[in-house]
């Protein structure tokens, strides 16, 4: 059984990746100092993703969500911590097919996300995107991309647009450890470095590319170091700690907005469920998964900070109840919403008449 040695790879503090001769390096970020309200907001968004994805799993089992469905459970701290440093309406986000969490982390209404998952006209992509292809120019969320690694050059392109327009924005391009082996990723690295584009390349390293562990697929597993040949600095971050992620995100945003070019953030994280809903994940042991849940869970990690800040357990219980109700309302809304009209087949296409 192939096993991803997450414990040995995950740093306790964010650290700078491989040294790059004759180049500036970003400072080593500290753990973000959040006040009580910020801690609660981080927890609320992470818990929303967790409960939303759990409900997605149920709806998929009932046949209300069709096609592929990739859940974000376990990785919540990455999207929430990183996107808390971005400015909605200015900065762009693009990711792969495991996208629900990124949309919710950006504050997008769970009702229209759930409606999209169930193929309804009121979904954020009018029922045509489904789980893998959600899209919203209004929110500067550019997918949801089903082709492995294809979002990375698009993320560099979004950064080019920000630089060309001189609007002060940057782009965050998320991809996984499996995507990191795609050739187009290195083409994007090269152009982003050459043109000093304001792009944050976010590697969500959850240890497995579908069912293949990182050790079986990579001759060199330090993914953060792969940008060194292009002069791109990197930070390796504990992606199970939202405050570590938030601290690294601040450094990354400051770096790209200072005109220093791209930066890589390798987030050491873990997904609790299989690659998709059809994956029983027999390639890893139950003990491995349970260890991550019991000893490294991002919500439990943040709870310690909340308790230290004086937040009582009862307040978190009430917050969980409220979020469960919001998720229920989102699911009810999605189930009752109408399906798209037949005419919707002919919208948003390149050629409408032959």
From Swiss-Prot:
EC number: 1.2.4.1
Keywords: Oxidoreductase, Pyruvate, Thiamine pyrophosphate
GO CC annotations on file: intracellular membrane-bounded organelle
One Gene Ontology MF term: pyruvate dehydrogenase (acetyl-transferring) activity
InterPro entries: DH_E1, PDH_E1_Alpha_Subunit, Pyrv_DH_E1_asu_subgrp-y, THDP-binding
Cofactor(s) this protein cannot do without: thiamine diphosphate
GO BP: any one term: pyruvate decarboxylation to acetyl-CoA
UniProt superkingdom: Bacteria
Keyword Oxidoreductase: yes
Keyword Transport appears in the UniProt entry: no
Sequence segments annotated as region (Disordered): 1-29
Catalytic activity entry: N(6)-[(R)-lipoyl]-L-lysyl-[protein] + pyruvate + H(+) = N(6)-[(R)-S(8)-acetyldihydrolipoyl]-L-lysyl-[protein] + CO2
Assembly description: Heterodimer of an alpha and a beta chain.
Cited function: The pyruvate dehydrogenase complex catalyzes the overall conversion of pyruvate to acetyl-CoA and CO(2). It contains multiple copies of three enzymatic components: pyruvate dehydrogenase (E1), dihydrolipoamide acetyltransferase (E2) and lipoamide dehydrogenase (E3).
Name used for this protein in its record: Pyruvate dehydrogenase E1 component subunit alpha
Organism: Zymomonas mobilis subsp. mobilis (strain ATCC 31821 / ZM4 / CP4)
